[in-house]
Amino acid sequence: MTAREGRAPRVRRVAVYGAVGLAAIAGVAIWSGAASHRGADTARLSADAAARDGASAAPPPPARPASAGMPSPLAGSSAPRLPLDAAGHLAKSRAVRDFFDYCLSARSDLSATALDALVVREIAAQLDGTMAQPEALDVWHRYRAYLDALAKLPDAGAVDKSDLGALQLALDQRVSIAYRTLGDWSQPFFGAEQWRQRYDLARLKIAQDRTLTEAQKAERLAALAQQMPGDERAARQKADRQQAAIDQIAQLQKSGATPDAMRAQLTQTLGPDAAARVAQMQQDDASWQSRYADYAAQRAQIEAAGLSPQDRDAQIAALRQRMFTKPGEAVRAASLDRGAAAAR
């Protein structure tokens, strides 16, 4: 295993999950091209995502195990829950997109037909025989149409981040495609994300306006911030605190601070509970790195054994399942394997 293999951004992971526990607010993430699909992170989404997005209290029926033969990126994980409203219909919630993005994390391993079959099975595992089942299938077909339309854009929609006009055009194109393909699902799927992207673009335009003095820029940025909804403003403030925590932890690690010194410093700025969570995350991370190193060594032995691709992949998948037993760990290991293979 290389020095970098198996290491997701450690400082960021510790800060996000340990110190603050809130996912960072996306910046102008739209500009990276086609929509990204969250594999291991989406696999760990909790069942209360529907409540977070305002779905009614009616619980979905208990999920039944999906069919065997899950693709390797999803091995050892389970799909996020599909939320229902009080009448038993599929709730118009971001959680539905999270479910589809979970399935899409296996896209590189599956043909289009196999991916459709996977989604059909996963929907049936939760909604078989309910009125929400055909509704979920319809939304899936709409979402696929959205992604297919994005893929047909020049360079899959990627643009030069320094070209504000191109950024504006890209955002407008995506909004139009989402509305055309998703209809009234475009708002729950992308509404909050699009608002943040428009807000960030407006900030960039002010910051890069050479006709404004620094004082005028500050005034306009402050006025723009006042237009932000209260919940969004609170989320931004938490994200700012999170980034400050990330920066502080990175600086402490860079300076070679001992675990006790780091915990004492973080206790002053983040409080004892958050500092304790950071310490626990560091211990968990060290344990993960050690286990992944052992796994990678055994994986290398399997790869060097001259097996057929099918037997090799089966043995590596079985090894992952033996060594990574906690929810999401096998998915994370598989993701790191793919990244290491791409780098070789």
Curated annotation (Swiss-Prot):
Pfam families: Lipase_chap (PF03280). The keyword Translocase does not apply. It is found in: Cell inner membrane. GO terms for cellular component: plasma membrane. The chain crosses the membrane at residues 14-34. InterPro entries: Lipase_chaperone. It is a single-pass membrane protein. Belongs to the lipase chaperone family. This is Lipase chaperone. Keywords: Cell inner membrane, Cell membrane, Chaperone, Lipid degradation, Lipid metabolism, Membrane, Transmembrane, Transmembrane helix. GO terms for molecular function: unfolded protein binding. HAMAP family: Lipase_chap (MF_00790). One of its GO terms (biological process) is protein folding. May be involved in the folding of the extracellular lipase during its passage through the periplasm. Residues 45-78 are annotated as: Disordered. Its main location: membrane. Residues 45-57 have a biased composition (Low complexity).
